[in-house]
Amino acid sequence: MPRGFLVKRTKRTGGLYRVRLAERVFPLLGPQGAPPFLEEAPSASLPGAERATPPTREEPGKGLTAEAAREQSGSPCRAAGVSPGTGGREGAEWRAGGREGPGPSPSPSPSPAKPAGAELRRAFLERCLSSPVSAESFPGGAAAVAAFSCSVAPAAAPTPGEQFLLPLRAPFPEPALQPDPAPLSAALQSLKRAAGGERRGKAPTDCASGPAAAGIKKPKAMRKLSFADEVTTSPVLGLKIKEEEPGAPSRGLGGSRTPLGEFICQLCKEQYADPFALAQHRCSRIVRVEYRCPECDKVFSCPANLASHRRWHKPRPAAANAATVSSADGKPPSSSSSSSRDSGAIASFLAEGKENSRIERTADQHPQARDSSGADQHPDSAPRQGLQVLTHPEPPLPQGPYTEGVLGRRVPVPGSTSGGRGSEIFVCPYCHKKFRRQAYLRKHLSTHEAGSARALAPGFGSERGAPLAFACPLCGAHFPTADIREKHRLWHAVREELLLPALAGAPPETSGPSGPSDGSAQQIFSCKHCPSTFFSSPGLTRHINKCHPSESRQVLLLQMPLRPGC
């Protein structure tokens, strides 16, 4: 634990003491010579008759006589200009008690009695200044009382020794000089100052002797919190708070009904009766900030997300230029406009990312070379290896699975406008499985042979200009591998009645690529390891995992008659 981590609180507050009036008046005398309490002096010195007699103003002459005697005898209060601090009778009694030692109280002094008004004023001041609160608040109160009593009722002159011991104080009427503070309070304050100085002096030495002497801790700079934009900044990403219009009145509940609770929107000042209504409230000052991509019209709520998204568009022009160069150096484009559109759809699918999958692509944008699968085919040969991009038909379009111009292009929806863009589906050219997104189709294409992907891409590696060696003997279609060709022959065997009218030029009788409209024929999934066929993709997957494990799989040419699946 670092040094100075636990600080012992040794500073104790001093006790509250009631300073005796005699100690304030005679600070130079020790405790042996301390006079008795002044409050007890009048009651102890006065005789019983004087204590019992109520103070009256019937003796004005005696007061004048005392003043005259005071002037004749030479009072030390006026001659020396000092205040003895007590009345004459109290001083005389104290002197008598100090000389004779402890014993019975001496006889009352023959000095005349004090006037009644002076006695009342002295008792009132003593009563007001005898409490500790008054003594602490007015440290010079006792001296003022003593000076006041001396000026009102002087007594006999003190001895020269006592006069020397008395402190030199200004008379009461002079307000310029202030009396000295109490000695006990001054001693306590000096002790506190000394302790504080020692503590401050030890602090740098402790810091220097510690292990972290090189880096003295600096006070942390407090972060200045700025609440200037508190009403214009929303904590939710993508939202912004509009500034309040100066003339817009605050809306509230209809009628004069008072809401049950204080559920008020802090922005538009609308009041609600319950917190649920306030939670469902859509404030008019909160607006959504949209950051739209200029290339694909995607909307983001943060500019950083938009900048990260736009990086996906950067490689696209390079891929398009490479495809254009490959089309210029490779085979010449076909004279048929339909074949150029088909190859353009395939190339755009491979070149563009998934962010732009739903954008309308024009037919003349980035013209590409024709698909290599149809390079050596006749115009009436089918099928063409490409990507089929369809819109959802309502009702479904009657078309065959291998007809000319269906695969690899978008078929418009009947009755829809040319500028309108509907939902699209993407059909696998091998198993005719439909997908709603390009990413799903890309993942599905990886399950087929690697040669099928090379057949889709006209500019893929060294096979860019090489002809496809595996041709179908029935329709003349060329395929990159024998497995895909045998799968194609399997489709010929299963749907021969559907393919023959399409190849002869007759209109197809099916309602879609999956089979006839009556539902008698379904899509068939064949195993590439054995002649088994299935009507669903999960069934084929289960068959492959069960019957053809990875260590014993062998590619078999499908030249045997079909048999039902296991």
UniProtKB/Swiss-Prot annotation:
Residues 1-20 are annotated as: SNAG domain. SUPFAM superfamilies: beta-beta-alpha zinc fingers. Pfam families: zf-C2H2 (PF00096). It comes from the Eukaryota. Expressed in heart, liver, skeletal muscle, kidney and pancreas, and, to a lesser extent, in brain, lung and spleen. In the pancreas, expressed in islet cells, including insulin- and glucagon-producing alpha- and beta-cells, but not in acinar cells (at protein level). Detected in adrenal glands, particularly in the deeper layer of the cortex (at protein level). Residues 103-113 have a biased composition (Pro residues). GO terms for cellular component: cytoplasm; nucleus; transcription repressor complex. May function as a growth suppressor or tumor suppressor in liver cells and in certain neurons. This is Insulinoma-associated protein 2. One of its GO terms (molecular function) is RNA polymerase II cis-regulatory region sequence-specific DNA binding. It is found in: Cytoplasm; Nucleus. Residues 352-369 have a biased composition (Basic and acidic residues). InterPro entries: INSM1/2, Znf_C2H2_sf, Znf_C2H2_type. Residues 318-348 have a biased composition (Low complexity). One of its GO terms (biological process) is negative regulation of transcription by RNA polymerase II. Residues 32-117, 310-418 are annotated as: Disordered. Keywords: Cytoplasm, DNA-binding, Metal-binding, Nucleus, Repeat, Transcription, Transcription regulation, Zinc, Zinc-finger. A zinc finger (C2H2-type) spans 263-283, 291-313, 426-448, 470-492, 525-548.
